[in-house]
Amino acid sequence: MIGQLTGLVGQIEGERCIVDVNGVGYVVSASTRTLAVLPQPPSVARVLIETIVREDAIQLFGFATTDERDWFRLLTTVQSVGAKVALAILSANNPGELLLAINAGDKGSLTRAAGVGPRLADRILSELRNKVAKMPGGGGTVSAPGIVSGPSVENDALLALAGLGFRRAEAWPVLSKVLAENENATLDLAIRLSLKDLAR
């Protein structure tokens, strides 16, 4: 199972994007919220992945936060809520709004999503009311390249550079220098500056 992809963001179109990892382009479906925070191609990003295996296909669904991924998993436990409807709900409501809507029995917030009518909204409220106490309310760990420098940026940048064909032994000294000179570098900036030095 694929749980995360770190690679170059390729084409973003409709409700999906392509993430290029070491020359292999993975088609990832995502909510409009996740697609909106992805950097413009051909920048590097880390995307959390939920893999769904069916008889005729393997589908990858991407998320910018752990909260959004957890809500996707919870929503798809509801009868008649498939992956497409779950993404539509997450496009219409962020995790915090979903938590408030379900606790308040707010059917209108759910019916804003494509494919969710009053009857399905009632079912979602009924089935999830007792489950949302354990759900996150909208914080979470952003897994796009806006995180400032630290262990996460360092590790993700090394993984991305390895995915682009660079050995750790050659990438690590360059990346260390980049992060030392750019303390607040984002993941995308750290990788771009490292690639610039490695290409010399």
UniProtKB/Swiss-Prot annotation:
Record protein name field: Holliday junction branch migration complex subunit RuvA
Protein species of origin: Gluconobacter oxydans (strain 621H)
Region of interest (Domain III), ranges: 149-200
Keyword annotations of the record: Cytoplasm, DNA damage, DNA recombination, DNA repair, DNA-binding
Ranges for region Domain I: 1-64
A Pfam family reported for this protein in Swiss-Prot or TrEMBL: HHH_5
Quaternary structure and partners: Homotetramer. Forms an RuvA(8)-RuvB(12)-Holliday junction (HJ) complex. HJ DNA is sandwiched between 2 RuvA tetramers; dsDNA enters through RuvA and exits via RuvB. An RuvB hexamer assembles on each DNA strand where it exits the tetramer. Each RuvB hexamer is contacted by two RuvA subunits (via domain III) on 2 adjacent RuvB subunits; this complex drives branch migration. In the full resolvosome a probable DNA-RuvA(4)-RuvB(12)-RuvC(2) complex forms which resolves the HJ.
A single GO BP: DNA recombination
